[in-house]
Every structure is written in C-alpha cells, then in structure tokens.
Swiss-Prot record:
It comes from the Viruses. This is Uncharacterized 41.0 kDa protein in P143-LEF5 intergenic region. The lineage of its organism: Viruses, Viruses incertae sedis, Naldaviricetes, Lefavirales, Baculoviridae. SUPFAM superfamilies: HAD-like. InterPro entries: DUF705, HAD-like_sf, HAD_SF_ppase_IIIC.
Length: 343
C-alpha cells in the first residue's frame, strides 16, 4: 500500500473584536478569500535541484527548505531525481551531486506541471513525495496524490501494465455521457466510436459520477457503456472522510467505490473531482505513471488541477454534438505528444 498523505482541511473560527465591536465574520472571510486568491495567482520562484545520477528517474521530493534533506539517508535521497522548494539555495557541503535551476510559476499543480515538463523536456513526471514529519504547505500539493518518501522503493517496484505512460481521461456521467432524463439515454451515439478511438491514442478511460452506485451501474448498463472504462468511481460529492466501500464487478474488472480521502476544498459550493482520488486508484491498478490528466465534465466547479479540462454543455435530452468535444480531447493529446515526441 502506498504511503498516501491525508491532509485534513483546516477549520477556522474567525472572530475579530475592534474597539469592543465584532467585525462581521462574513466580511473577514470574503477578505481572506480574495487575499488568498491573489496569493495563489502570484508567480513563485521555485528552486529545483536535479541529481542526474539518481537511481530512479522523474520522481520529485517537495521540501520546505533545503536543510530538510538532512533528515533523509543519502541512499534514499539518491533515488530521487528532483528536489523542489520555494526559497534560496544555500550551497552546502553535504550534497554535491545536484545541479540547480529555477522555475517561475504559480503555486498550482497544473501550472507547475506544465512549466516543469517544458523546462526538463519530460513527457511525463514521476510521483510527488514529501517527508512525512516535515510536509510543506504549498497549495499545489492539496488535492494531489502526495506520497511518503519512505514508500518510494515500494512504488518503484510496482509492475506497470503500460510500456509507454498513457494519457488519462476522466469522464463525468450525468449530462455528459448520458441525458438527465428519468429514463436515461446516450448523449450521442458517436460516443461509442469516440471512446474506442481514444484507447488507440494510448488513453486510460475512467468514469467518475457523483451518483450512487446503483444509479451508475444501472445507467451504464442501460446505455451499454459498461465495458469501456478501466476505473469507475461513484460518490464523493460531500467533503470529509469517506469509508472505502468497494464492490468488484468481476465481469468488467472495475470497482464501484466511495472516495476514502479528506478533501481540502470545503469552501466551495460544489466539491471538485480531486485528482488525488483518481491518481490513488490508478496506482492501485498498476498504472504508475501517466502523461496527462483530462477531465470531461459539464460542471465547471468539478475541475481542479487537471492538465486539461473539457467543459461541455449539458444534455437534458440527446444532442448530436460529441464530435465537437471529442475533437477537443484528441487535439490536446495529439499536440502534447507532438511537443514531447522525443522525450
């Protein structure tokens, strides 16, 4: 089992008293929300240390400061190619294997992944690791699969089922692939052929519906989409910790599960579909590395940190428009593979 760091959401009880008067709590929250949003949009100067002689490639260790590396044995550290943190690098005596670079980007995973892969000409990245007792508080680590550095060897030893890391495409179900009617229908018959085509582009297809398991199973069976997806997830709309309640469909080799994670996003109306959940199930299906992560969903709020987001229109009833959305998915994948063709 991989060492997955559970990051609990912080709950702040804000009470401000100025000259014996209580400031309206809502005003304080709105101010802090705007201030936090402004901070997130700022670019940061990330220090990247690269060990070209590392035993395993592409994995990244995030630390708060360079001196945190003293807590890790040299043998383990030699298995990490990249060490990343915000701040200056004080040249030290104890590690001379690193080459230092800088990346300027937002404290946000999508932006970081784009800049990082472009900088180092990598078509895919390894896993994200932290030191458990010194975990950084960077925003980009929230809602992402963050692993314990001491589980690195275990993760490295997983036998992946893909020779070349795939692209991962996560589909919503209701009002995306099927209609919102009581008697659900397929959105567009072109969907079947389009899903088959994506597999030829080396894509792993996943489905994540906020509906309950019975609704998901019955709907997929009715519109004959039950054999297309490697991973099927149900539930996860509410914030908090979910019990891992899984049921295996042995015929189709998929799972219908609730998300066993604390979700960090508690201050929004709709809880987004956290990549952390998707990545956790991928690694448990021996899909260890991937190139890109795409979300296809009719709800804008469901997107957070995905490399690509296809925000399609709703479909209360069938509509013949899938070619438009399929083209957006394929164009992103083709352009990406062309950009990183030799990497």
């Amino acid at each position: 089992m991989t060492g997955v760091m559970k990051v609990k959401s912080s709950v702040f009880n804000i009470l401000r008293i100025v000259r014996y008067k209580v400031i309206n709590e809502t005003v304080v929250i709105v101010f802090l929300s705007k201030f936090t949003k402004h901070i997130k949009q700022m670019n940061h100067r990330w220090t990247v240390l690269r060990n070209s002689w590392s035993l395993t490639k592409r994995h990244i260790l995030f630390v708060t400061k360079y001196s945190d590396l003293k807590d890790i044995q040299k043998e383990l550290l030699n298995s990490v190619e990249f060490v990343v943190f915000i701040g200056d690098f004080t040249k030290s005596i104890f590690f001379s294997d690193y080459k230092m670079d800088n990346i300027v980007c937002k404290d946000e995973m999508q932006d970081f992944r784009q800049h990082f892969k472009t900088k180092y000409k990598l078509s895919y990245m390894g896993h994200i690791f932290v030191i458990p007792h010194k975990q950084p508080t960077y925003d980009l680590l929230t809602e992402w699969l963050v692993c314990n550095i001491y589980s690195l060897q275990e993760i490295t030893n997983i036998n992946t089922i893909y020779f070349e890391p795939p692209h991962v495409v996560v589909f919503d179900m209701d009002s995306t692939l099927i209609t919102d009617e009581d008697q659900v229908r397929i959105r567009d018959p072109a969907i079947y052929e389009a899903l088959d085509a994506l597999k030829k582009y080396n894509c792993v297809l996943c489905l994540w519906s906020y509906g309950d398991k019975e609704h998901v199973v019955n709907s997929l069976n009715k519109v004959k989409l039950d054999g297309y997806f490697k991973i099927i997830l149900s539930g996860g709309r509410k914030a908090g910790e979910y019990q891992l309640n899984e049921e295996e469909d042995r015929y189709y080799n998929v799972y219908y599960e609730s998300t066993p994670f604390y979700l960090n996003m508690t201050d929004v109306k709709n809880i987004p579909k956290s990549p952390r959940v998707v990545l956790w199930y991928l690694i448990n299906h021996n899909i260890v590395l991937f190139k890109t992560l795409t979300l296809v969903d009719d709800l804008f709020d469901n997107n957070i940190y995905y490399d690509n987001f296809v925000n399609l229109s709703t479909c209360p009833v069938p509509v013949n428009d899938w070619d438009k959305w399929h083209t957006q998915i394929v164009r992103f994948i083709v352009n990406y593979d062309k950009k990183f063709k030799n990497y």
